């Protein structure tokens, strides 16, 4: 292996895509489930340069002949370059997080900062916050240690913090929908930053947006930025305009990885358009109504007849949440998807929602669709739900 990534679990890593998009060299993902395997790999030194992820960012320091002062202060190395058999260690997570905050206008000067979590990324983000002038940096833990000044999540709400940084895996794929901090009860918040990048918007970020926090941003751009800066170490050269490269690759990744969800009135053409778009874009096509039928074993009219609309909506939400957390799909949604806010949240977390708008007189009536059995039903549905489609 010349270039690559080592870590215990790499199944959902974007690093290969980013590095090969950026530089064109072959980049391997090398999962090393045990410490023994990691030590054996590092001892052999059969690579030009590697990135290191959880849980080996501290362990790798034992094998480095040189460690960058910033990486040494943080206590973690995520980038290693082999120079004639000697390993040089750096921390580009610091640079990536710093870029993310600068790019989105996060102002640390004089602010109180809450960092959720006590793991390795806590030290990185804390260093950035302090270096950028934070007045106070507080640590939040599910099991706080009072002797270390750590806060519980309940105490954090009344801390008066202006900035929240999540460094925990809460809300990360596949366990999406988790949020441990009540940001809606924190009126002084100016920014919420989550280092988690999958899904694109964690539950924490969605709640921050709903609460009107001015800056609410996930970790994808940080991931790309640290990779760009790592590649500079790999190749021993600077990119002409690193911020431009970071924006370009972040945008390309987001276009490629996010879902496209089609919503609109019943019979507005979502399924037909969806199949065409999925084929054109090379995406997996998902029709949520079809998935409900597959899972339940009954037709939609039969489900309505047996369980009513509430029973059907419960099944619809389950399928929306199942597919909404995945990526690279074209999702066609039922006409009533907007009736439950949690459906839109599930679609927003990892996707772009497009509203297919057609006039009522152009829509087909009936066809076994309980909500559109007549023109009167259509007109009533459109009058009452257009605002929800445009949310």
Predicted regions and their residues:
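Phosphate/diphosphate ligand-binding glycine-rich loop within oxidoreductases
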Residues: 2-104, 199, 205-207, 211, ...
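Rossmann-like adenosine-cofactor binding region
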Residues: 148-216, 337-344
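Conserved small/polar residues in nucleotide/adenosyl-binding loops
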Residues: 379-386
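Glycine-rich adenosine-cofactor-binding loop
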Residues: 7, 91, 110-130, 264-266
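Conserved phosphate-donor/acceptor-positioning beta-strand/loop module used by diverse small-molecule
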Residues: 347-367
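Adenosine-phosphate binding glycine-rich loop
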Residues: 195-257
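ATP-dependent small-molecule kinase phosphotransfer cores
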Residues: 290-348
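NAD(P)-binding Rossmann-fold cofactor-contacting core
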Residues: 134-147
